[in-house]
Amino acid sequence: INEINEVYIGHEDVQTAKMVAGEVSYKAQSVNLPSGPVLLQNAEKGNYSVKLRPTIGMSVFSLNLTTQDEAKRAVFNDLNFRKAMSHAINRDQINEIAYFGLGTPLQYTAFDADTAAFVTSDQRNANIKFDQDGAKKLLDAANVKDQDGDGDRDLPNGQEFRLNIQFATQGVAAQVVEIIAQNWSDIGITTSIKEVTSDEYRASQSANELDVHVWNKGEPLAVFLGDTAELVPPFASYFGLRNGMLWEQYI
């Protein structure tokens, strides 16, 4: 191979359309399951083949516990807030829309729970029940309330509370991000989304510029234990989901 020409396409639907039209020689990263039916239906016409490979990875969302915004940082480190944001997510809807009902909603356990006998059912299912009323009560307990009557919740200091999720489709399907952003907005945490390149996402994450971290994670316990980057802040290499960038500076 003398030359590889790679073009970034900023919208997943446009990327899929180009693959259907046979304009792509090879594509692996950033091709997510929701595109599967369209790609399979048009494989003969587009003169390409589709290989669906199994994976142990799962879409992981985390709040930046060392975000530069100190008011948000205090909220993100409140366990009531984090539980609320988890209970607000409609995982069954995500499973049906993004995974065609083939997935199993689970809590993230840092490694593939099926490779570790000590991971309990309670840990696998911690805070994953879709309960927006319960989520609102937890937000109240975290003092994240609507203080000005506009219908949106504010930070405890009275400042406007807005979240922006920057994501790359290499790490998560756009449909998953869209559903979660709407779920969070429904409980009063107005959330917007922006698709960026993988390089842009990684640079912003490592510069501690993101409120929410989003990536695909999953590896066997043996691999996890052999990778020291997973055990100390920021808990991943540059190419993974990182959290606690300021903790890394402290250490």
Residue ranges and their predicted role:
Residues 1-100, 104-105, 114-151, 155-251:
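Extracytoplasmic/periplasmic ligand-capture domains
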Residues 109-110:
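Outer-membrane beta-barrel and related beta-rich outer-membrane complex signature
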